Amino acid sequence: MKKPPVPLLQNGVRADGRLPDQMREVKISVGVVSNADGSAMVSYGATTAVAAVYGPREMHPRHLSLPDRGVMRVRYHMAPFSTKDERKSPTPSRREIEISKVLREALEPAVLLEQYPRSRIDVFIEIIQADGSTRVASLTAASLALADAGIYMRDLVVGVSVGLVDGVVVLDLNGLEDNYGEGDLPVGYMPNLKRFVLLQLDGAWKREVFLQALNLAVKGAEYVYQIARDALKNKYMSIAEEIYGR
């Protein structure tokens, strides 16, 4: 295992000053892309994801459409300037293609695609700053963008990450913990339905540690959900005030 440049955990405190069960600062804005049908920006600390939704609209070419449900397409992409490392190529990497598929499969259970036969819904996600947990921040942003677009949904999907750092379960991995920790578990969760839609286990986990991690992920997701719900509510309250002058 690679040695981290700084200790990841000392006396129960993480390198960035958080306790094991603390999220980084969560910031959420809705309606940030003016030409999209729905959009959202989600920041977990220094990780920021922007999602834009276009649709539902007619599928082209038509032979790819489905008669009884819509098709959702998801593209996850990291901006060339998003990391402190070398500028990445703008061409989608194998990792980005794989994460795009994972995010689509996590979002589909939340969306009532049967309401949109012969249609498509396109979801574009751009990571503009990366410091760990990019796929789960993307999941939250994409879910909010779908809701902002008025897409029929069973529930919002909230993404959080948990991991193992020096044998301790921690919430919301930053970049150092992501790179040097002993394991990570990205989680997608629908808080109202109490249903997991994404679990990707990496590393060796004992059963009791895995269950502890799941419980911590649920608590983190419920915390983020409240912020996400407030962001949606605030947007539409401000629209109502503009229309009705209240």
Curated annotation (Swiss-Prot):
Species of provenance: Pyrobaculum arsenaticum (strain DSM 13514 / JCM 11321 / PZ6)
EC number, UniProt record: 3.1.13.-
Annotated function: Catalytic component of the exosome, which is a complex involved in RNA degradation. Has 3'->5' exoribonuclease activity. Can also synthesize heteromeric RNA-tails.
Annotated Gene3D superfamilies: GHMP Kinase, N-terminal domain (3.30.230.70)
Subunit (UniProt): Component of the archaeal exosome complex. Forms a hexameric ring-like arrangement composed of 3 Rrp41-Rrp42 heterodimers. The hexameric ring associates with a trimer of Rrp4 and/or Csl4 subunits.
Cross-referenced InterPro entries: ExoRNase_PH_dom1 (IPR001247), ExoRNase_PH_dom2 (IPR015847), ExoRNase_PH_dom2_sf (IPR036345), PNPase/RNase_PH_dom_sf (IPR027408), Ribosomal_Su5_D2-typ_SF (IPR020568), RNase_PH (IPR050080), Rrp41 (IPR011807)
One GO cellular component term: cytoplasmic exosome (RNase complex)
Keyword Nuclease attached: yes
NCBIfam families xref list: ECX1
Keyword entries, A-Z: Cytoplasm, Exonuclease, Exosome, Hydrolase, Nuclease
An example Gene Ontology biological process: rRNA catabolic process
Pfam family, one: RNase_PH
MF term (GO), any: 3'-5'-RNA exonuclease activity
Keyword set includes Hydrolase: yes
Name the UniProt record assigns to this protein: Exosome complex component Rrp41
HAMAP family assigned to the protein according to its UniProt record, in alphabetical order: Exosome_Rrp41 (MF_00591)
Assigned protein family: Belongs to the RNase PH family. Rrp41 subfamily.
The organism's taxonomic lineage, starting at the top: Archaea, Thermoproteota, Thermoprotei, Thermoproteales, Thermoproteaceae
